[in-house]
Regions:
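Nucleotide/phosphate-binding sheet-loop regions of phosphoryl- and nucleotidyl-transfer enzymes
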Residues: 1-232
Length: 232
């Protein structure tokens, strides 16, 4: 954040969200630890056939270690796992146009750790199914209605109306159903490798910059496509 003063237009490099978070951190406000992948990386991503190059991947690993130390949690740890949110950060807000992924870092093993850590199995399983649904939709391209239909059918079978009436075992069953629908629609398994999850989520946010809805929004609001987005 000390380096922020040296950047002439931080929003151009870090995006609106990243620049504001960095500024708040510099002021000593209580901001959750994190890091921003700059708009320059977005440009490199598209020039590199829509892939993150090895230098960027290594830098992400370094920043992740710094974050782990600051929160005393480890990404993928089986006792106290670090969970991440991956969000877009254009220099001008584009509400609802770009993709976000929450609870990243959950898999079949870390969800058990989260359950033990929070003493709340229902919360842990619900968080995991939300992540699988978000990841399946945003990263793997499975339309959201497939997941919603599974939930509605499950509630009908159980004879309940609200998601809050589903318990830990119910969400456990739906987690399996969600994985099956991902496999059925994509012919790929939902990834258990959490670093693969992270890199794919970052790539998905960069790709959402060129989604149809984002292009239309930019056209209507005269936002240049070459600006790109940061990732927070």
């Amino acid at each position: 954040s000390k380096e922020l003063k040296k950047i002439k237009n931080p929003k151009n490099i870090l995006g609106g969200k990243g620049a504001n978070l960095s500024e708040m951190g510099r002021m000593g406000l209580p901001v959750p630890p994190g890091f921003t992948i700059s708009t320059d990386v977005c440009d490199l991503f598209y020039k590199n056939k829509k892939k993150l190059n090895s230098k960027i991947v290594n830098q992400i690993k370094i920043e992740l270690k710094v974050m782990e130390k600051s929160v005393n949690k480890k990404f993928g740890d089986l006792k106290n796992p670090l969970l991440l949110s991956v969000r877009s950060g254009a220099r001008i807000s584009m509400p609802g146009m770009m993709d976000t992924i929450l609870n990243l870092g959950l898999n079949d093993k870390t969800v058990v750790a989260l359950s033990k850590r929070t003493s709340n199995g229902r919360f842990a399983k619900d968080s995991y199914r939300r992540f699988i649904q978000m990841y399946g939709n945003v990263v793997m391209g499975v339309e959201n209605h497939h997941f919603e239909e599974l939930i509605e059918n499950y509630k009908l079978t159980k004879g309940v109306l609200l998601d809050t009436e589903l318990d830990e075992n119910d969400w456990d069953g739906l987690i399996d159903d969600f994985k099956k629908v991902i496999k059925d629609k994509t012919h790929k398994d939902f990834p258990q490798d959490i670093f693969e999850q992270l890199l794919s989520a970052i790539s998905a946010v960069f790709l959402s910059w060129e989604s149809n809805r984002a292009k239309i929004y930019r056209k209507l609001n005269q936002i240049p496509s070459e600006w790109g987005t940061a990732v927070n």
